[in-house]
Design a protein with these regions (language model features):
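Short beta-strand-to-loop acidic/aromatic patch adjacent to the donor-nucleotide binding site
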Residues: 83-97
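Short acidic/polar active-site loop segments enriched in Thr and Asp
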Residues: 29, 85, 115
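Catalytic-site signature of metal-activated, phosphate-bearing donor transferases
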Residues: 69-71, 98-193
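N-proximal low-complexity "stem/linker" segments adjacent to membrane-targeting elements
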Residues: 1-21
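Short, acidic, metal-binding catalytic loop of nucleotide-sugar glycosyltransferases
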Residues: 21-30
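Short beta-strand/loop segment that forms part of the nucleotide-sugar
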Residues: 29-37, 58-61
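Active-site-proximal specificity loops/subdomain of glycosyltransferases
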Residues: 43-86
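Ser/Thr-glycine-rich phosphate-binding loops at phosphate-binding pockets of nucleotides
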Residues: 7, 34-42
Length: 193
C-alpha cells in the first residue's frame, strides 16, 4: 500500500515542516505539493523534502486560485506517477490522526468497495502566547463538528471539490463503490497561527 498526500501551500513556513514530518512518521510515503505565491521561507523547506525524494513540488503562478482544479491534478498524479493506493488531500494546517496505529494501519481496515472516506475535523484556537509552537498554544478545541475532510483511493478520474471536503469518481459510482464516514481517523486543524 502506498499513501500519497497532496497539499496546497502559501506562506506556510511556520507549520509545513512539522506537517510533513508528522505525516511521514505516520505512514505517508510521498507528498505532491503545489505552492501558490509563497513569499516566506516555505519554498526553502519544500525543496529540502524534494531533495530527500519524498516530495514533488509544483509552482502555480496564476493570479487566480483554482484550488479544486490543482488538487484534482495532484490527486490524479498520485496514481499516474507514484502508483498510490490512497490519496489524502490535505491543507498545511491539518493533521490526520488515526485512533490506532498509523495511517497505513487505518487504510488496511477499509472495505474494498469503499472508495472515499469522510473524516471529522476539529478546529484548535489559541489560549496562550503566540511565542509557543502552534500545537502547544492551541489548547482550545472546538467540539462542534466542522466540514468533514475527504480522502480517497487513487483513481484516474477522481475530481476533488474545493476545500478537499469531497471527491467523486464517475467510474466508481457506476460500479457500485461507495463512501463511508469514520471515527477511527480524525483531522486536527490549526487555522489561526
Amino acid at each position: 500500500m502506498k499513501i500519497v498526500m497532496t497539499i496546497m501551500v502559501r506562506n506556510e513556513e511556520d507549520i509545513i515542516g512539522e506537517n510533513l514530518e508528522y505525516h511521514l512518521n505516520n505512514g505517508v510515503d510521498h507528498f505532491i505539493i503545489t505552492d501558490h505565491h509563497s513569499t516566506d521561507g516555505t519554498m526553502d523547506i519544500l525543496r529540502e523534502y524534494e531533495r530527500k525524494g519524498v516530495a514533488d513540488v509544483r509552482i502555480e503562478q496564476s493570479e487566480e486560485h483554482h484550488q479544486a482544479q490543482w488538487v484534482t491534478e495532484m490527486a490524479r498524479l498520485a496514481l499516474s506517477k507514484y502508483d498510490a493506493s490512497w490519496v489524502i488531500n490535505n491543507d498545511a494546517d491539518e493533521f490526520w490522526i488515526p485512533q490506532k496505529g498509523n495511517l497505513k494501519d487505518f487504510f488496511h481496515t477499509i472495505p474494498q468497495l469503499t472508495y472515499k472516506i469522510h473524516v471529522s475535523r476539529f478546529d484548535f484556537f489559541y489560549k496562550f502566547s503566540k511565542d509557543l509552537k502552534f500545537y502547544d498554544a492551541m489548547l482550545f478545541r472546538e467540539f462542534q463538528r466542522r466540514w468533514t475532510k475527504c480522502c480517497h483511493r487513487a483513481l484516474s478520474d477522481i475530481s476533488v471539490e474545493v476545500g478537499n471536503h469531497d471527491a467523486n469518481s464517475e467510474s466508481m459510482n457506476i460500479q457500485g463503490y461507495g463512501s463511508s464516514g469514520t471515527v477511527d481517523l480524525i483531522v486536527f486543524h490549526y487555522p489561526i497561527r
